Amino acid sequence: PEQLDRMAQGMVDLVNKTRSAMSIDDYHFDVDAHDEVAHQAAIESMVLLKNDDDILPVAANAKIAVIGEFARTPRYQGGGSSHITPTKMTSFLDTLAARGVDVAFAPGFTLDLEPADRTLEAEAVETAKNADVVLMFLGLPEAAESEGFDRETLDIPAKQVELLKAVAAENKNIVVVLSNGSVVSVAPGAGNAKGILESWLLG
């Protein structure tokens, strides 16, 4: 018991000594500067996997449809112990709006592992029909990957693949932007999209 008390007291002493250093009440930093570093890192980490017919870069006057909830609710971190609370976060749709780019948006699916929502799917297909270019934000929702379990497949959720095929039946000018923290199969995009951009977790 005495040895246990000594060991425990050592931990208590360490906590007391470091408590002030761990306080963030008086901690200040340049949020915008840090955000710019993260922004630049995100840009430089993307990998262009496919670009048939030079579909990228998108022409300035192109009519753009953006499909996929990831465009509005981006994944910027992994699951489990890596969770953080960001000081600033900007979605793809936020960025387009800030630059004055007008796009048609439809979420197409929900960020969970539930079956497809046919109403969302139909809305997305209709949104994509008359666009010059369709940017489809697909990938792995947080529920599909984490440090606490193994994945059983390399595929993105079936409802997203179904949506991609449905949109491709109406519009062939598709660029898939992938959002994932671990490897995924690009086979669905390879057959149904002219462009594939691997963006990982842009945090």
Question: Which residues does each PLM region occupy?
Answer:
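C-terminal non-catalytic regions of proteins with extracellular/luminal or membrane-system context
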Residues: 1, 13, 32, 36-203
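Flexible, acidic loop-helix segments that line cofactor/substrate-binding pockets
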Residues: 20-34
